[in-house]
Regions:
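Bacterial N-terminal signal peptides that target proteins for export
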Residues: 1-10
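C-terminal and inter-domain tail/linker signature
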Residues: 22-283
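N-terminal signal peptide c-region/cleavage motif recognized by signal peptidases
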Residues: 18-20
């Protein structure tokens, strides 16, 4: 009982005075959740000064190093929904953030990496109007309604299983070996704001998978408790910055979310350098 009380006090103090006590819980699940809470608060206020940032912080947006002073985290955003994956094994988190503000909507995927008592990296995949199939109203309609809840301990897939499922899906984009992907049913894939499913048991994530697209530079954040894995990657070497977020149940894919940034002037649909077509054959 005393350990529970002590842990609660430490976490409460971390949220109120992060620089002083964050180190005590930094790479535990609770500590990483506390770091995420600080990020959400910072993004809501447009002020990261309350975050325990490392002196040599790496701040990255759409796979480009940028000055945090001119970044999206400096903009106060009204966050309508967020969902977080926590990876204690690598001391990282990933948070999907949805902002439906009509004046400037966003869907953002943010990775935090903690180094001892400091946030050493903040990497955001920032999507907005003009990015791949972007439609925040649709994304907001579907994402919060999906079940990404905690998987019971006896039913959790291993880290290797989760990463293997993600890799099999991403590998299929090159040679279209769809039989090697652990498809689950029903499964729904959301790309930007387009969805494959129709709300029936036969819904499939297999619809509209392209070929000839080499998805490279993959980096994974894995949450076994949630049965989820996210891949930061690009469509071809130097291609479009992307995240794929997967929910896996009993080794099978159930949900896939895709955020893809299209740099100004970049065309899509050109094999390895492009994005192929959307799930319902959109360009």
């Amino acid at each position: 009982m005393s350990r529970i009380v002590c842990k609660w006090i430490v976490l409460s103090t971390a949220l109120l005075a992060p620089a002083a006590s964050f180190a005590q819980v930094a790479c535990t699940r609770d500590g990483l959740q506390a770091a995420t809470n600080l990020y959400i608060e910072a993004q809501s206020k447009g002020d990261p000064s309350g975050m325990p940032l490392a002196n040599g912080l790496a701040y990255i947006e759409n796979m480009q190093v940028v000055d945090i002073k001119s970044s999206v985290i400096q903009k106060p955003l009204k966050i309508d929904f967020h969902r977080t994956l926590i990876d204690p094994a690598t001391c990282q988190t990933f948070t999907e953030v949805i902002v439906t503000d009509k004046s400037h909507p966003y869907v953002i995927g943010t990775r935090l990496r903690i180094n001892h008592d400091k946030i050493a990296e903040i990497e955001s995949l920032v999507t907005q109007d003009g990015d791949w199939l972007f439609n925040v109203d649709n994304y907001y309609k579907w994402s919060p309604a999906e079940d990404w809840g905690v998987v019971p301990p006896g039913q959790r897939d291993s880290r290797d299983t989760l990463v293997a499922a993600a890799n099999a899906y991403l590998d299929a984009f090159l040679e279209k070996k769809l039989d090697l992907v652990p498809w689950g049913y029903p499964c729904n894939r959301t790309e930007g704001g387009i969805r494959t499913g129709k709300g029936v048991p036969e819904d499939s994530c297999q619809v509209g998978v392209p070929s000839g697209v080499n998805i490279v530079a993959r980096r994974f954040i894995v949450d076994e408790t949630m049965g989820a894995v996210v891949a930061f990657c690009t469509f071809g070497v130097g291609g479009l910055p992307d995240t794929h977020i997967f929910r896996v149940e009993k080794g099978k894919l159930r949900f896939v979310h895709t955020l893809t940034h299209v740099p100004e002037g970049r065309q899509v649909g050109r094999g390895g350098q492009g994005r192929g077509r959307g799930p319902n054959n959109e360009k």
